[in-house]
Amino acid sequence: KLKNKIFIIALSLLLSISAFSNPDEVRKKDLRIVEKIYYLKDSEVPFTGKVSEGRDRLYYLNGKQDGKWISFYKNGNIKSIVTWKNGKLNGKYIIYENNGRKSTETIYKDGKENGYYYLYNSNGTYRTKGAYSMGKPVGEWEYYDKDGKLTNKVIAE
């Protein structure tokens, strides 16, 4: 009787642990890539799920990058926030310096820059301001010195 109770308790514990673990979460080293599609090393089915690398969180849908990816510096500060859709950059793309200041901010659509583009000096002032339309610079671009003073304006053709 006691052996049966111990077995039932052990089995219940094992089942509860497996119910709360996420089988879709893996490490990047567990993936392989074939023609821009990601697979688990032992699978022929394109991978869908979350990949964890330290604090970084990367998401895949049908073997392609998908969703908001956030990566971190070793000090815990955010390194980048980028958005993917169907394996292409799509949405906000923000890069930060190790100290937490924004370095670059732009928007992508279907893998091409499409919208505003801001490059910042390390003191937080603008270094470059401009815009893209489907990967091509458009409109007025402004360039600034390290103190944030406007030094040049160029019209993109």
Language-model features, listed with the residues they occupy:
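Bacterial N-terminal signal peptides that target proteins for export
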Residues: 1-8
